[in-house]
Amino acid sequence: MKKLLTTTASVLAGLTISFNLLAGSNVQLDRANTDIRDQKSLQNGAQLFMDYCSGCHSISFMRYNRIAEDLFLDDIVEAYKQAKTNLLTNKPLSATDFQALSNAVDNSVKNIKQAKESLGKLSDSQIEKNLSKATDRMVEKNLVFNADKVGSPIISSMPKKGAEAWFGTTPPDLSLVARSKGTDWIYTYLRSFYKDDSRPFGVNNKVLTNVSMPDVLWHLKESKSTKDFNQDVRDITNFLDYVGEPAKLVRVDLGYKVLGFLFILFILSYLLKKEYWRDVKYGKWKAKD
Ligand code: HEC
């Protein structure tokens, strides 16, 4: 039995070591410390991904309008609620408020009277629809750089043949990269390019040796403090983590609610237990034997 255990242990250890070697974990990975609930970080990550990565990489499992709904809709709804409160309490309306009200009625709103009239004609569900439409429009304007529509999957427009000629390989689809490589890997990889004149693009990478991707973030790195640059890379990594599993947003949120429920249930059960045991303690209750 003992021998069997030792053999199993050494086989497992051997496997772990070889998997680690395969995964190239001889490089110390930095902790990404991303937080999928941080919506500002995800928004910045989405913008940076579209600006710096989408020219080469697709994330074909993701559609633009899903990003709109998951990452930007909340802000648009929030702005509308604020504008509506200001409108109903007769506070002065800012340009942002007018924009938010225009979003809600799906028409350009120019004055208070018009805002009140237009809103009065719409049901809540119509307003919801309009706000979602406005979010799609915003995403189409800021994140879609090619002729794609907001309902399309996010596909890079780089021709496959060209990519192979330029890089020796096609840039991989990044839909699931956070799940296959992990966030720490991506975070470290993007910050590990170094100058190497023997390589076609003049750079190499500590995590992915002889990499065929250029250091696309070098300009960003030079124009910012290290702290801000690291935050930008963290945001891109966070965004890729979200792309790998969009349902995580719902799951994490649900997890907190379940824990909250269990906590309340714990208090109630404890009080109930005390109530039952009080009778036992004071001898009012005796088991029938
Ligand atoms: C100019 C084209 C180009 C751009 C722009 C680009 N990449 Fe790449 N990327 C590549 C190529 C080519 C590879 C394959 C590298 C290799 O295997 O040697 C790659 C590989 C990767 C990998 C490794 C994937 C894997 O599974 O091995 C990740 C992660 C990655 N890129 C992320 C990014 C991110 C994030 C951005 C934007 C900040 C970006 N890339 C911008 C061309 C590009």
Regions found by a protein language model. Give the residues of each.
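Bacterial N-terminal signal peptides that target proteins for export
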Residues: 1-12
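Electrostatic cytochrome c docking/interface patches
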Residues: 24-47, 58-69, 244, 248-253
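Gly/Gly-Pro-rich "capping" loops immediately C-terminal to redox-active cysteine motifs
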Residues: 35-36, 61-182, 187-191, 200-225
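The canonical Cys-X-X-Cys-His
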Residues: 49-60, 236
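Conserved nucleotide-binding/hydrolysis modules and their immediate coupling elements
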Residues: 197
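Extended, hydrophilic extramembrane loops/domains of integral membrane proteins
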Residues: 207, 212-245, 249
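Juxtamembrane interface at the cytosolic side of transmembrane helices
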Residues: 251-255, 262-289
